[in-house]
Amino acid sequence: ATKGTVALGGGSDAATLTIEPTVVVDPDPAEPLMADEIFGPILPILTVANLEEAIDFVNSRPKPLAAYLFTKAKAIRERVITGVPAGGMMVNQLLFQFATAKLPFGGVGPSGIGAYHGRFGFEEFSHRKSVLTKPTRPDLGAMIYPPYTEKAWKLARKIF
C-alpha cells in the first residue's frame, strides 16, 4: 500500500507471478517504497519545485545504486552529475549501464561498494598482492647508482 496516487498499473497476479509496471505519484517519503531500493517494475514520481529541491531530496537519503536523468540542458546534466552521489548515472537512457560490460556497475555506501562487469569486475574482485624480495647478498645497487657514499667511492678506487 502507498499513500501516493497509483497513476498506472498496480495490479499483480500471484498465480502467474506477475506484477504490472506501476507508476506512483507523490508517495510519502517515509513509506517503504521510498525507503528501500526498488527491484521491481515500480516508478515513484515526486513533485518538486525546482532542480535544487530534487537534488537535496536525493542527498537527504542513502546513496542510490543508480540515478536516471532526462534532459536536453547541459547545465542541468552537469549539476546533477556533480550533485548526486550515485553508484552510476544514466542521462536520457535507462538500465544500459547494467547491461553492458563496457561500463562499471556498482553502488556506493549502503547500495554496495565497488564496481563489476567486464574488466572492471575482474579488477574489482582480484587482489593485487605486493611482493618485494630483497636478496640476502650485499646490495650492489647502492654502490652502482648515485648518490654515492664514501664507502662506494673507496670500493670503486680499489677495483679500478
Question: Where are the regions a protein language model picked out?
Answer:
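Short, solvent-exposed loop/turn elements at beta->coil junctions and helix N-caps
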Residues: G9-A14, L94-L95
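Conserved C-terminal structural/oligomerization subdomain of aldehyde/semialdehyde dehydrogenase
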Residues: T18-F160
